[in-house]
Amino acid sequence: NYDAFCRMKESAYFINVGRGPIVVEEDLAKALEEGQIRAAGLDVMRIEPLPIDSPLLKIQDSSKLIITPHTAWATSEARQRCVDVVTENIKAFLRGEDKNIVRG
């Protein structure tokens, strides 16, 4: 991972919202500390909760790393969209309409 971070532009922002284990956190922390990339945003980590000795927790500059453990989806807009979709699905059901049909 460290070599990949070194190939990125120094202005790069690394975002991981998919799978924690795909990132070598020690390499990410090193790349951030050395300025190889600008910043990172993580919604998933290799081990959750993040261990107290994680190198990510040692990063002093808070502008370099944002960690949102599985809460990045929880903006007010995202929650409102969930409510809107559920409401529309219930209304469609009450009207006898098919909605979001998945066929194999």
Please annotate each region the language model reported:
Residues Y2, C6, S11-G104:
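Rossmann-like dinucleotide-binding domain for NAD(H)/NADP(H)
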